Amino acid sequence: MQDLVRPRGAQVAAFGSGGDTDAVFSDADAAALYDVMNPWNPAGWPADAFYDDLVMAADSVLDVGCGTGSMLRHAREQGHRGRLVGLDPDRAALDRARRRTDIEWVEALASDARWRAEFNLATMVSHAFQCLVTDDELRTSLSAIRAALREGARFVFETRHPQARAWESWSPSHTSDIVDSAGRALRVWHEVESVVNGVVTFTGTTAGSDGGVLHVSRSHLRFLDVETLDAFLAEAGFEIEARYGDWDRRPIDETSREIITIARRT
């Protein structure tokens, strides 16, 4: 999955951001565009392959912030026979996910999850974890995820390392041109509004070939350093099983762009 800025663009707004949409470009169009721009592709993207291996080895998987459900849909297509559950508050994204009826799709926030010891793997892929912006959102979401896991089960996710300052490339000078599923030529770009106390606020704009703006969303992502992240995990009842700075599983160092975490429920 390419993950141009915030992967799963359709569900960014669902985690607390708003957006304006032209009448000819609906929320459903935004969800479909996300799938066109970010297909789940383990053969082409190391991040997708990393998660694919974990999901295929687990008999019960909860994907928190599943968006259009591309990871779980791919797992089922590849022969996963266990329980697969996708959780997301974005209705348009879930409507697209629900085309696959042999997976459970739940419309809710992470903090609203009420499962008890039902899964042996929980995931938040494509930097979805960064949509948990406030301390309260982090605490309540981590608590709910831990409760959903069996004892000793894993919670696996990644967050961008703040030292890499990824947001500095989120600007109108970095655009993506693409043809959507309806055959429309579109241009997509992002622009940072502010960076305050580790929270980056930015807009995402989709325009037509004539330059007319079709959709604008405003989003917030939190960048946690390792020490702060680990404090939240320990408080919630997780211990770190493995930690990587890139998808080739190299340790975190001063060049790392990611904080990839495999945490275990204690």
What are these regions (language model features)?
Residues 2-67:
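Conserved class I S-adenosyl-L-methionine
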Residues 139-151:
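A short glycine-rich, Lys/Arg-flanked "PGG" loop and its adjoining helix->strand segment in the class I
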Residues 224-266:
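C-terminal lobe and adjacent flexible extensions of AdoMet/dcAdoMet transferase-like proteins
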Residues 69-112:
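Class I SAM-dependent methyltransferase SAM/SAH-binding core
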Residues 120-136:
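A short SAM/SAH-binding and catalytic strip from SAM-dependent methyltransferases
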